[in-house]
Amino acid sequence: MEISTLRHRTGPCRFSLVPVLVAAALALAVGGLSGVALAQEDPLAYRLEIYVVSHVTREDGTREERYTETSEARPGQTVEYRIFVENVSDMTLPAGVVQIRLPVPEGTEYVPNSATPSSDRVLTEFSADRGMTFSEPPVLVGDDEQRRVAEPTAYEEIRWTFFVELEPGQEETLVYRVIVR
């Protein structure tokens, strides 16, 4: 499944984020839980919001970020994904069990240091080899003989593992940004 498209129109190319939304939702559903036997229904509900980030200079000279909800973006624009994960089951989900994986869509580059960072609540890891391996930065790629550190702009997936129990009704928010090429 292709997760991004470039649509040509009269004027500049636009990056369609709608297929990305669908693919991200699928990635969430597939990567939602690992290592736990649960009923067939997913105990997690997901909501994804997509914003174009712009910067404006206020009268006092300070810069401020503005967010515009969108389904399309143009090359050079920064897009912020906000993922809301809620435990919709009636049971507490154990710490270390809930994992969320999301792609860095084709046609975009991950913005360094933009993902919800690792903390005592969540571990944030990246992959630069199509999800084969994940690690916290620095992310290494290549064979043993040609091992090198991947630039953050080469990251292809992000994985978060929650180190806290998720109580029924509890919602957690994850964020990351990309730049449209």
What kind of feature is each model-predicted range?
Residues 1-15:
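N-terminal secretory signal peptides that target proteins for export/translocation
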Residues 11, 31-35:
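Residue-identity detector for glycine
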Residues 7, 27-31, 57:
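Compositionally biased, low-complexity repeat tracts
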Residues 13-14, 18, 176:
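Structural motif marking the loop-to-transmembrane transition
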Residues 2-3, 37-181:
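Exported/extracytosolic protein signature
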Residues 4, 24-28, 69:
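Exposed boundary/loop context
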Residues 16-32:
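Bacterial N-terminal signal peptides
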